[in-house]
Structure formats: structure tokens, C-alpha cells
Amino acid sequence: MECEREVSEVSVPVSPSGQYLNSSVLSLSILAVLESEIPIDDSQTMSLLKNVFLPINPRFSSIMVEGKKGVKKWKRVEVKLEDHINVPRFAEGMSLEFYDKNFNDYLSKISLDQFPHNQPLWEIHIIKYPTSNAAGNVIFKLHHALGDGFSLMGALLSCLQRADNPAIPLTFPSRQSNSKKECKTTSIFKCVPKIFTRVINTVQDFGWSYMKSRFVEDDRSPIRSGEGGFRATTITTLTFSLDCVKQIKAKLKVTINDVITGIIFLGTRLYMEETSHESGKASSTALVLFNTRAIGGYKSISEMVKPNAEMPWGNRFTFLQVPIPKLANAGDAADESSSNPLRFVMKAHHLIKRKRNSAAVYLIGTMLDTLRKLRGPEATARYLHSTLKNSSLGISNLIGPVEPMTLANYPVRGLYFTVNGGPEDLSITVVSYVEKLRVAVRMDKSFIDPQKFNSCIEKAFDMIFRAAVESTSPAISSTKVSNKNKKEIKSS
């Protein structure tokens, strides 16, 4: 069955970042997994895609073609929906463990598959078999050239409704920043030194970022083989209580992002130390991705695609290269301030705040644009590939809705996403949904032990929560959460 759409003769240029992310050296895709509480009937799929998904954005009905001078453009085409829908068949009547393994193997396989060049860059995979986490799963595979996580999450949410009242829009946790008010409430004598410090930090951060991307690789370690290339991966998930994370946030007066990053940093170092004691001294860097929009919540797609939109559609992200603090017992090179687990959160807070307050992230964007104009998108893609390859870990997070939601009247039990196609051995993505934080870990299947790594992340969460809360009753609560999380670590 074809989706009847008029093919436009006008081709729209692909954004610069879209060209970087779909090149001969770098081709990134996003897997978004929606877990259903009830078994899935795929009979509504065609109508949902035709009437709801395709109209969201013309890019979902376009292919990427190369024009004059190698400039890529979006060209509208007729969409054959059956070419984009995949419903795999597994053996019937098997155990949940059997379907867990089959689902994980299938997820690993499609994460490596490339999109055909002659059709729009998206797919949907419907898994109608139960797993330990859900009665069924719907997987959206979307090429990163279509948009970043913010854009694509907004697109998916356009297909979803509130479970309690579909007429009311989904709501999201507020994200407020006082950075803009900082100098308004501070005397000019205190503000000038801060501006001077930011200038110095900008020069240092930009120079260090350039060196890390071009010349300086992280040490080889239990989380970085240094081999590059594309190998089979495995994707596992963990679930944490958002309320517990908020308790840590309130105690330390930091952001939820700082808490998440601190937990990941500590858990990663614990894994490295347990795997190889000498690796505690390894120099390791995390590539922390963040959105450059002034996010206050997701906008409707109609608002995002307007000219000069406040929060426009597309790829509007940049990265921070943040050194992962070392454990205090890792030798002379250790960061002595990290002996307390809370120091990992505070270290993440100070490093990220310092780097975000410098203009280095914007200079990096300007440099990439200049590189594209002078040497073309392929050269820019090689620079980004080198940035990923020289780092040990990628971290990205998104805000999800506060209320339970449904997809075509199917209650969504949980959701998570991963970014695939990069040369790094380890990538961690986080999304919130109904007072839960879902952490997805994509790792090299032959190099990193998934159970051990997840156990170390869980241990880091427990250590930081206990240290932050301090009193007896919350500590008991922490133990309960930790035990629950141990049951929720699944190979998804």
C-alpha cells in the first residue's frame, strides 16, 4: 500500500549538520523504543503512519540526493509504507528469557544496518512478543540527519496522547536557569572579573577541544579499545527513581543532569577499576552532548518548522569534552577530591558549568561551519568522527513527559533511546518518563561486560544516594531502590 502524496519538484537543501551526520565516514541513527503494557496488534500501523507520522515533517517523505558541487538536498518522493514497516517473527510459546535474547539480538542487528539510499531515512519495527520489560515493543529507527533528539522526540510525541485525557497536552518537567540573571543581581565590579575568567576559559576550552579532536586520544582502557570501526553492540537498560535523583539534586544544589553525569562517571570508574586495577590511572574523556536551544519544553511540530522559530526543527546540538574524574585510590594521578562519591557529582557540576559558561561550544560550531565551507561536509564529518573516536564515552539525555501516555490507545509502559553508528565503544543515553529515569547503555559486545558495567552504575547510584541523604530512614529507602534496580537491569 502506498501513501498517496504529491511529489514536489522543489528540493530543499540539507542543513550543514545533516550533511555531516550522513556521510561516507559518519552515519548516525537514533533508535527510540516504546514499551507497551499490552500485546500489540499491528493492524493500525498503516493508517497511523499515513495520517499522523508522515504529515509531521516533509523530511519523512524525502530522500537525500546530491546536487551540484556535492551539495545534498531533500527531494520529496512517494512513500511505500510497506518498505518501512518490519514485523520480525520469532518462535512461538517460548520463555521471557528467550524473547529477551531475541529482542536484544534484533536491536543489535538493526542498529548496525544502513538505510537504503532510495527511500526516506526512517523505519518502524514492531515486536509482538513479550519481554521481561513489556508485552510488546515498537522501535522507531530514524536517521540523525532528519533532526536531533529534541526534534525527533517532539515528532514522536506528536503521535502520542495522554493516557488519562487525550484532549490535554503532555507536560514536561520545567528547566529553569538563573545564568541570565546572574549579572543583573551582581555589582559591575564582581561581573567584570567573571567576564574576564570566561574569556580565559573560552581560549583554554577551545584549544583543548581542538587538540582532543585532532591529535590527543584517550588512553586505552576497559571502556575504550582504541580500534575504532563498527562492531556488534549490545544495548541494556537500567531504571532509577527520579524522586531519589531529585533528593540528591536538592541536597547538593545542582541540576539533575549533574547528578546523572556524576553517577555515570563514578560507575564508569568503578567498572574500569574492577576490570583492570591499572586502568584507574587511565586518562578518559566523556563527550557530553547538549541542546543549544533555550529549552523550556517541547514545542508543537507546526511551531518548530516555522521560519525563525524560537525552538526550530533540525540538529541544534553541541558537545563538551569533559575529563572523567579518577578514583582516589588510583595512584598519584588520581583526583584527590573524588574520594567522596558526592565529589563525582560536584566535579561534573563544576566542569559542565565552567565549560557551558565559556564560548568554546559556539566557537566549535563556527569552526565546523568554516571547515565545511572551505573543505566540504566530508572533511567536517571526518573531524566529528575523530572527536568521537578519541573519546571514551558519549553521554546524551532528553526530558520525557510527566504523565503516562498512549500510542494508538496502547499504554506506553516505558521508553528509551540510543544513538548508533559512532566509532566509540560506549554510549549512554538517559530519558525521564513518569518519575523514572531510563538509562540505556550501548556497548561493544565483544569488549565490555554488560552485566558488570550495569552493576557498577547501580553501585554508583547507591553510593551517591546514601552519601547525599545521610540519615537512617532515607538510607533504608536507598537500599530498597537499589534492590529494585537490580531486578530492573535487563538486556533490552
Q: Residue spans of the language-model regions?
A:
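Soluble acyl-CoA-dependent acyltransferase catalytic core bearing the H(X)4D motif
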Residues: 2-10, 31-55, 62-424, 429-436, ...
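Generic start-of-chain signal for non-secretory N-termini
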Residues: 1-29
